[in-house]
Amino acid sequence: MSEKLYPVLAEAKRNTLIDNATYLEWYQESVSDPDSFWAKHGRRIDWFKPFTKVKNTDFNGDVSIKWYEDGVTNVSYNCIDRHLKSRGDQVAIIWEGDNPYIDKKITYRELHENVCRLANVLKKHGVKKGDRVTIYLPMIPEAAYAMLACARIGAVHSVVFAGFSPEALAGRIVDCESTFVITADEGVRGGKPVPLKENTDTAIDIAAKQYVMVNKVLTVRRTGGKVSWGPGRDLWYHQEVASVEPTCDPEPMNAEDPLFILYTSGSTGKPKGVLHTTGGYLVYASMTHQYVFDYHDGDIYWCTADVGWVTGHSYIVYGPLANGATTLMFEGVPNFPDQGRFWEVVDKHHVNIFYTAPTAIRALMGAGDEFVTRSSRSTLRLLGSVGEPINPEAWEWYYNVVGDQRSPIVDTWWQTETGGILITPLPGATDLKPGSATRPFFGIKPELVDNEGAVIEGAVDGNLCIIDSWPGQMRTLYGDHKRFIEAYFSTYKGKYFTGDGCRRDEDGYYWITGRVDDVLNISGHRLGTAEIESALVSHHSVSEAAVVGYPHPIKGQGIYCYVTLMTGEAVQDEDALRKELTQHVRKEIGPIATPDKIQFSPGLPKTRSGKIMRRILRKIAEDEFGALGDTSTLADPGVVDDLIENRQNKK
């Protein structure tokens, strides 16, 4: 745990929306009188019919979560129409293509026309309120148009990340019984084509065998690549939008009408369809976007996520657009054409707020500072981190090298299930500690419990629960409320269990230690894998590390470390470096954390969103690599063969 403290920067203090006194006052009100607090902030969005009820939630029994339940609104209206009078000609979306020479700016007025036309296409082909529409698109403006067009007519969108396999896509089509799919001929990532239409055709065949029939496929022409065509089923996007009216009235939606389903991996079985609804979700996404990122009118805001993940839903599309912001959508990858791409985009579009994942930060740190320092980055005012705990070494590099020590970092903790950020610093209010998500956002009541469910106070390690609802919370798992209760409310009765381990320090700051299934029990001691990974990465030779447990005859679990070295770091003597790293970890954490196995690897198995697939690493560490399951979602499946070949635990 980093002992360093970075006080709020003087510049941030002067200009931010929330200072520490305001944070403490608002937070107190939000937890002592949530009805009054959320009634006030619920009015940040426009309502066709104002709500009179605010909070109606119960984490016990059948678990029921309702916010603003008698209010009527529309998400698309809030993200577009209400801005037209005052900012119709302001840029809503900056699109930066995979190719660094291609970009596009879309104003709010243009966004309105594009969304209305697509909404009319959906209606023309029989899509109605409540129908599920699957969106399988790359990071192109049409992905945002598709989400907003669904919201406009009351259809429920299910966005499937364009890196997912046909099998994964089919599973998601079948689960929500979607009959309309929006895709592209191909996607482009790092200069390489991705066969989206072909994948869609395969997925539709798989779904048909499970008696779910897709009637229409609307295809965006992104590359002009050759695609197969099903007459009567397949439609070209450009032809369809040209054939309809450019205006479409937004459908009045009850606050608790579904907005979207987004599938997230369960620790067991098939993916879970997380369901978010209309009113509370938008209030929470827009409020967190404004205060966490200290968004001011005129800021250029860039979240590097993909719309296929919840971060893209809440912090590329819905939160920023509800706030009338200019949001940047990036089609490419951080290392194409080279490792300086992020910072070139920052300079090119004068980005003020930059939000990315620790995995990207660590990869770019491993490539060397010169890719960063050759850019100016003078417009950057705020940096953000999302997706997993950020190790202090990567935090320091991000702060010192990328941010030139003048941009606060908001290290945000949240989940697909939470709809928006739950624990985070606020740039003008929170002193920072590298690696800590710091304090709860307004209305969030974290609690740490031990394995028996007893509440533990003070500076302790425990299981992170949230004991009361907030407007952005998921309402259920689509079609499976029983599984929803079992997954989130049965482990600790009456509490939402996050599945994450957490440490609270003497200052009341929260440190996420990783998924509870990523917590090792070494000779009866709890150790978070994130902590050991952080120790390894603090060594000058190490770019990235992943740690898993494996069965150990004496200690119960042993510590197995996968280590990727810095670019250009050649290992003369593997055994000597293993000893050095082992000593380094002992020094950083203590003898209890001594690694049992260290395997050097050119890369780690990651999904295309940058998440490390720990399930695969655990299987290899256990020498059980015969049943690795679906590896089709990996960015580079070839990494797995190297890991198996060089495993340290061969029986």
From Swiss-Prot:
The modification N6-acetyllysine is found at residue 611. CoA binds at residues 189-192, 311, 335, 523, 586. Acetylated. Deacetylation by the SIR2-homolog deacetylase activates the enzyme. It is an enzyme of class 6 (ligase). GO terms for molecular function: acetate-CoA ligase activity; AMP binding; ATP binding; metal ion binding. It catalyses: acetate + ATP + CoA = acetyl-CoA + AMP + diphosphate. Transmembrane segments: none annotated. Its EC number is 6.2.1.1. One of its GO terms (cellular component) is cytosol. InterPro entries: Ac_CoA_lig, ACAS_N, AMP-bd_C, AMP-bd_C_sf, AMP-binding_CS, AMP-dep_synth/lig_dom, ANL_N_sf. Mg(2+) binds at residues 537, 539, 542. Its cofactor is Mg(2+). PANTHER family: ACETYL-COENZYME A SYNTHETASE, ACETYL-COENZYME A SYNTHETASE 1. HAMAP family: Ac_CoA_synth. Belongs to the ATP-dependent AMP-binding enzyme family. Catalyzes the conversion of acetate into acetyl-CoA (AcCoA), an essential intermediate at the junction of anabolic and catabolic pathways. AcsA undergoes a two-step reaction. In the first half reaction, AcsA combines acetate with ATP to form acetyl-adenylate (AcAMP) intermediate. In the second half reaction, it can then transfer the acetyl group from AcAMP to the sulfhydryl group of CoA, forming the product AcCoA. This is Acetyl-coenzyme A synthetase.
